[in-house]
């Protein structure tokens, strides 16, 4: 089964916890703190594997969670960093953040990698908190939580040429004639429901990859007839070969077909109109085809170059292939998304915190709920089993301005304050 879009969950590994320990050696009184730091959590890394051709494997495994870092140890020993979790994807995979729609990675070449979910840093051991006024601190941090997100994987086939047109115009037959590909061919609409790829050799030491894309219908740009799934694969092609049935046996007008398909390409993505398009008048071996071709030429005008062919008899196919090969040589590759200006925005793949530090809401029972990336991260990295860590967390909340914000919202002694699933009493 060909699968070209899936939604999966990824989570980087949490950092290892820091250690509270002290140096205990003979003849070394008051040895001081010796707790090591936790190791960094593993990243979730996508890597291109050229042997893959579909996202089928992701239908059976949709959750990818990397290992956490090793905890810190005594004698100042730091925890080990965990090995990154490598997730193999086929060439042509685009990774998008499900929540924001931001493109996180465009993976096209074998061995190319991208970090999709970063692991958290290790928590600091108590040796990191030693000061002149507190030489033996009872403080250590928990590991930083790893980044987690839902992502959409979209596979866009890597082909130089894309065959487009209405169903049953002869796209699959043409591909089978010019390459070794063997797409399914039958006398009914939508015989092709997945892209088929074939390597075409022109006979003069030139070759290119051609994709037979499923037939389009009116409204495809809006998703009609699985239009989004089909049009997605045209975005990477450099040349569009527009196949039109000149026989008229389907009861459609060739010129109306031409206008409809071009409108669908334009409505789906304006960049598709920038690609050179070769118009192919197919089924010229059929009755009335020549008459229909002349009427078609009168409507489109002389500026549109038309290649009359018969995919069945191979009439005109050779000239068509030479024209396509020439266009590929002179047409650059088109990016599938706008290039991000890194001077004004964040670098792609960078794990960024939210701009707002915290938000305070009040529930119907009077409980104050504090949320936000910074405060939730600080909370998760605090070891509440140790008094000094609790006091440090209270100082951090004051430093963030949370105490003052709670008072401004009307919080009084004894009111309940909630962070994540934990509740505290507010003490003014």
UniProtKB/Swiss-Prot annotation:
Subunit field text: Monomer.
Annotated source species: Bacillus thuringiensis (strain Al Hakam)
GO biological processes: ribosome biogenesis
Major site of localization recorded for this protein: cytoplasm
Named cofactor requirement(s): Mg(2+)
Binding-site positions, Mg(2+): 172, 192
UniProt cross-references to PROSITE patterns, sorted A to Z: G_OBG (PS51710), GTP1_OBG (PS00905), OBG (PS51883), OCT (PS51881)
Pfam assignment, any one: GTP1_OBG
Boundaries of every OCT domain copy: 350-428
Cellular component aspect of the GO annotation: cytoplasm
Binding residue positions for GTP: 165-172, 190-194, 212-215, 282-285, 310-312
Signal peptide: none
GO molecular function, one term: magnesium ion binding
This protein's encoding gene: obg
EC number of this enzyme: 3.6.5.-
Protein name according to UniProt: GTPase Obg
């Amino acid at each position: 089964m060909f699968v070209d879009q899936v939604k999966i969950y990824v989570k980087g590994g949490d950092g290892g916890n820091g250690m509270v320990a002290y140096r205990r050696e003979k003849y070394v009184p008051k040895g001081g703190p010796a707790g090591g730091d936790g190791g960094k959590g593993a990243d979730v890394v996508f890597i291109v594997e050229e042997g893959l051709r579909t996202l089928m494997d992701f239908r059976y495994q949709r959750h990818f969670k990397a290992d956490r870092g090793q905890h810190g140890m005594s004698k100042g020993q730091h925890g080990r960093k965990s090995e990154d979790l490598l997730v193999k994807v086929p060439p042509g995979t685009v990774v998008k953040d499900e929540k924001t729609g931001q493109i996180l990675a465009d993976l096209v070449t074998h061995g190319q990698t991208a970090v999709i979910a970063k692991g958290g840093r290790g928590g600091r051991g108590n040796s990191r908190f030693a000061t002149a006024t507190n030489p033996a601190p009872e403080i250590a941090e928990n590991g930083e939580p790893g980044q987690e997100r839902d992502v959409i994987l979209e596979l866009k086939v890597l082909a130089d040429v894309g065959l487009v047109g209405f169903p049953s115009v002869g796209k699959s037959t043409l591909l089978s004639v010019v390459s070794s590909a063997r797409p399914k061919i039958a006398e009914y609409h939508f015989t092709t429901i997945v892209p088929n790829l074939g390597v075409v050799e022109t006979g003069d030491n030139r070759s290119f990859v051609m994709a037979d894309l499923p037939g389009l219908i009116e409204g495809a740009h809006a998703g009609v007839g699985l239009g989004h799934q089909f049009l997605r694969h045209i975005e990477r092609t450099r040349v569009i070969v527009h196949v039109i049935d000149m026989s008229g046996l389907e009861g459609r007008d060739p010129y109306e077909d031409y206008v409809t398909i071009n409108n669908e390409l334009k409505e789906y993505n304006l960049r598709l109109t920038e690609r050179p398009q070769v118009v192919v008048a197919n089924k010229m071996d059929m009755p009335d085809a020549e008459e229909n071709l002349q009427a078609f030429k009168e409507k489109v005008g002389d500026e549109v170059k038309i290649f009359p062919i018969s995919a069945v008899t191979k009439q005109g196919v050779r000239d068509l292939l030479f024209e396509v090969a020439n266009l590929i040589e002179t047409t650059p590759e088109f990016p599938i998304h706008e290039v991000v200006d890194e001077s004004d925005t964040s670098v792609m793949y960078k794990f960024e915190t939210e701009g707002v530090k915290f938000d305070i809401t009040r529930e119907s029972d009077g409980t104050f709920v504090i949320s936000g990336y910074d405060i939730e991260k600080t909370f998760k990295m605090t070891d509440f089993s140790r008094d000094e860590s609790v006091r440090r967390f209270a100082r951090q909340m004051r430093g963030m301005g949370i105490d003052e914000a709670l008072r401004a919202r009307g919080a009084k002694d004894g009111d309940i304050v909630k962070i994540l699933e934990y509740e505290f009493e507010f003490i003014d």
